C-alpha cells in the first residue's frame, strides 16, 4: 500500500471537509434582532421568581430559573413564545400528562423599552443592566478622585514593592501589541472612559508577551475569514497599576479585584488579554452580549440570554482564542489567559 498517497488523500479530504464546514459556519451567522425586539429582552423579576427573555432563531423564548445560584441561566427551563400580535405572545407548557397555555404580554415605556412582563396572572418587573441596545442601565463607576488624589495614589503605587513570591516563574518578553497585524487597540484603562473614571496607564499603548502576541496574530487571521478582527481592550498590566487600582477602589469594592499583595493579576504576567470583535469592513466594534467590565449576569461566558447573534459572536471569539493557546474564564467572556498552566512570573515593568 502506498501510505504516502493515502495520507495525501486523507489530507485533501480533511481540507475539503474543513472548507465546507468553514463555509457552513460563515453562512450560519445569525441576523441581528430588530431593535424593538432587543428592547424587551432581558431580566424580569417578581413573585420571588426570576425570568429571562431572549431571542433565539428569530423567536422569543422565556427562560425560568429554579435557583438564584444559576447566575448564567444555564439550567433554566426554556419556553418558546408564539407571537399573536405586537407584544402579545402565547406560552405553551406541555407535559406527558397535562398541558397548559398562558398569555405573555409586555408593557413598554414611552421610549419603547420593556418595563414589565405579564405571564398569565403574574407580573414581572424589568431590571435594566448595562448600556447595550435595549438596555438603559448605568455603567459601573466607582467614586471619583481629584487629579491631585490620583497623582498621590499613583506615587504610592509606584513606590510600593512587589512581593518577591510574585516574581517567581517564567518571564515573558513584552512586545508592542500594535505590531500584530490587524489587531485594533482600544486601551480601556489608558482612557478615562472606564469604571475608575480616569486612565490607569500613562499611555494608551498596550503590550503583551511575545508568544501570546504571535498567538493573537493567528486568531486574527482565523477571524478574518468570518469578516471580523480582534479588538484588544487590555493586556499587560504592571503590578504597580494593579496596586493603583486597588488603592483607588472604595473599601467595600476591593474584593472585586485580586489582592495585589497576595495574588496579583494574571494581566501582570503579560499573558492575559481582554478582547472583543470588530467588523473588518467598517472598522466598527461589534455589539457583544454585554459591555466591558459590566457587573451583571451578562458578563458570564455561559450566559444564556441576549440574541442569537450576540451568543454566536461571543462563542466564536472563545472558540478562536482557545484554538490558539488561550483559555477563557467563566466570570468574564472577554478575558483570556495564554497557556494558563504555565507558572508565569508577574512583572512590574512600566512601559
Where are these regions (language model features)?
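Beta-rich nucleic-acid/ligand-interaction surfaces
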Residues: 239-245, 336-343
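Extracytoplasmic cell-surface/polysaccharide-interacting catalytic and binding patches
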Residues: 134-233, 248-331, 339-351
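Bacterial N-terminal signal peptides
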Residues: 9-20
Amino acid at each position: 500500500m502506498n501510505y504516502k498517497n493515502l495520507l495525501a488523500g486523507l489530507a485533501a479530504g480533511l481540507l475539503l471537509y474543513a472548507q465546507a464546514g468553514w463555509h457552513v459556519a460563515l453562512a450560519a451567522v445569525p441576523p441581528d434582532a430588530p431593535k424593538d425586539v432587543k428592547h424587551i429582552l432581558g431580566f424580569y423579576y417578581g413573585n420571588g421568581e426570576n425570568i429571562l427573555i431572549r431571542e433565539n432563531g428569530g423567536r422569543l423564548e422565556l427562560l425560568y430559573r429554579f435557583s438564584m445560584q444559576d447566575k448564567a441561566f444555564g439550567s433554566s427551563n426554556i419556553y418558546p413564545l408564539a407571537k399573536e400580535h405586537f407584544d402579545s405572545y402565547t406560552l405553551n407548557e406541555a407535559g406527558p400528562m397535562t398541558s397548559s397555555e398562558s398569555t405573555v404580554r409586555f408593557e413598554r415605556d414611552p421610549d419603547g423599552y420593556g418595563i414589565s412582563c405579564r405571564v398569565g396572572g403574574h407580573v414581572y418587573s424589568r431590571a435594566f443592566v448595562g448600556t447595550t441596545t435595549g438596555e438603559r442601565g448605568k455603567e459601573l463607576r466607582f467614586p471619583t478622585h481629584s487629579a491631585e488624589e490620583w497623582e498621590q495614589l499613583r506615587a504610592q503605587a509606584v513606590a510600593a514593592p512587589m512581593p518577591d513570591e510574585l516574581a517567581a516563574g517564567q518571564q515573558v518578553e513584552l512586545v508592542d501589541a500594535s505590531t500584530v497585524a490587524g489587531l485594533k487597540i482600544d486601551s480601556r484603562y489608558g482612557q478615562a472612559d472606564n469604571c475608575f473614571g480616569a486612565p490607569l496607564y500613562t499611555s494608551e499603548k498596550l503590550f503583551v508577551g511575545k508568544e501570546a502576541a504571535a498567538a493573537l496574530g493567528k486568531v486574527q487571521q482565523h477571524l478574518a475569514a468570518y469578516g471580523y478582527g480582534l479588538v484588544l481592550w487590555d493586556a499587560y498590566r504592571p503590578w504597580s497599576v494593579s496596586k493603583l487600582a486597588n488603592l483607588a477602589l472604595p473599601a467595600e469594592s476591593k474584593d472585586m479585584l485580586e489582592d495585589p499583595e497576595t495574588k496579583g493579576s494574571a494581566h501582570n504576567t503579560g499573558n492575559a488579554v481582554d478582547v472583543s470583535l470588530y467588523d473588518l469592513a467598517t472598522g466598527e466594534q461589534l455589539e457583544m452580549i454585554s459591555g466591558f467590565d459590566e457587573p451583571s449576569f451578562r458578563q458570564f461566558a455561559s450566559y444564556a440570554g441576549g440574541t442569537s447573534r450576540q451568543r454566536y459572536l461571543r462563542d466564536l471569539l472563545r472558540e478562536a482564542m482557545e484554538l490558539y493557546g488561550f483559555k477563557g474564564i467563566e466570570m468574564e467572556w472577554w478575558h483570556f489567559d495564554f497557556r494558563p498552566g504555565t507558572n508565569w512570573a508577574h512583572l512590574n515593568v512600566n512601559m
